[in-house]
Amino acid sequence: MSAIGSQKRLTPPRISAMKGGKPIVCLTAYTTPMARLLDDHCDLLLVGDSLGMVLYGMETTIGVTLDMMIAHGKAVMRGVAKACVVVDMPFGSYQESKEVAFRNAVRILQETGCDAVKLEGGEEMAETIAFLTKRGIPVMGHIGLMPQQVQTAGGYRSVGHSEHETSKIRRDAHAIGGSGAFAVVIEGTVEPLAREVTSAMHIPTIGIGASAACDGQVLVSDDILGLFNDFKPRFVKRYDELGKRVADAVAAYAEDVRSRKFPAADHTFKRRP
């Protein structure tokens, strides 16, 4: 591990202790340069399986592999000095059994040096989370809209509108709260329900398209920076339009090359006397 990664960082217990306090700031990171830029400003960095869509052009997160998550987890860890780093367990790496989940979670922690793993699911995954946490693996849960289940859920849509959905999310929150998870992401959930769940849980809730009452917020970094333009979720606030700025910079470079303005004398090497 690099020297920067060996310095004191926020830990899952410290994140858990932030329940009800100053809101927890979380963003996604997939690369070393981005991790370095985000680290000073974030409490949590999530190496999300959203990288499949953001970096690899996939339509969903289903095609993301364990090896991909580990590679990007390693990259992020090289750029972090302060933030707690959580790596997503990709689809198929934990659903088969709690023993398979344990083996794959151990791989992620050992090979990346990250602080915790995150997995999606409510009641059906509570036993697996408990199995992992009892064996020393910090776990963040994920309820509400679950992107890895998008193909069976009928697409990306907010949840908690019907009594059936509301009841399920309440049960999921209760199950995850009792599983030993140190925090839980609640995604794409109607605001009143997300607020209620946050109040009822003893662990921090990290909202994404949920409620300002959540104990923290997470967004995809490329979304808030305007670097990912395939689609823009309603819950995203754009803080810059870097995509346009990158395109403008590249257009200026291309023009300089074609007009032979670049490289200028300052960008070339002189023969030594």
From Swiss-Prot:
Compartments it resides in: Cytoplasm
One GO MF term attached to the UniProt entry: magnesium ion binding
A cellular component annotation (GO) from this entry: cytoplasm
InterPro entries (UniProt xref): Pantoate_hydroxy_MeTrfase, Pyrv/PenolPyrv_kinase-like_dom, Pyrv_kinase-like_dom_sf
Annotated active site: 187
Predominant place of localization: cytoplasm
Cofactor note: Binds 1 Mg(2+) ion per subunit.
The keyword Cell cycle is assigned to this record: no
Cofactor(s) it depends on: Mg(2+)
SUPFAM superfamilies for the chain: Phosphoenolpyruvate/pyruvate domain (SSF51621)
Entry's transmembrane regions: none
Residues noted as binding Mg(2+) in the record, renumbered to the chain: 49, 88, 120
Keyword terms, alphabetized: Cytoplasm, Magnesium, Metal-binding, Pantothenate biosynthesis, Plasmid, Transferase
Reactions catalysed, as given in the entry: 3-methyl-2-oxobutanoate + (6R)-5,10-methylene-5,6,7,8-tetrahydrofolate + H2O = 2-dehydropantoate + (6S)-5,6,7,8-tetrahydrofolate
UniProt GO BP: pantothenate biosynthetic process
UniProt keyword Nucleus, yes or no: no
E.C. code: 2.1.2.11
Pathway: Cofactor biosynthesis; (R)-pantothenate biosynthesis; (R)-pantoate from 3-methyl-2-oxobutanoate: step 1/2
Subunit structure: Homodecamer; pentamer of dimers.
Functional summary from the UniProt entry: Catalyzes the reversible reaction in which hydroxymethyl group from 5,10-methylenetetrahydrofolate is transferred onto alpha-ketoisovalerate to form ketopantoate.
Family of this protein: Belongs to the PanB family.
Protein name: 3-methyl-2-oxobutanoate hydroxymethyltransferase
Species per Swiss-Prot/TrEMBL record: Rhizobium etli (strain ATCC 51251 / DSM 11541 / JCM 21823 / NBRC 15573 / CFN 42)
Organism phylogeny: Bacteria, Pseudomonadati, Pseudomonadota, Alphaproteobacteria, Hyphomicrobiales
Gene name, Swiss-Prot/TrEMBL: panB
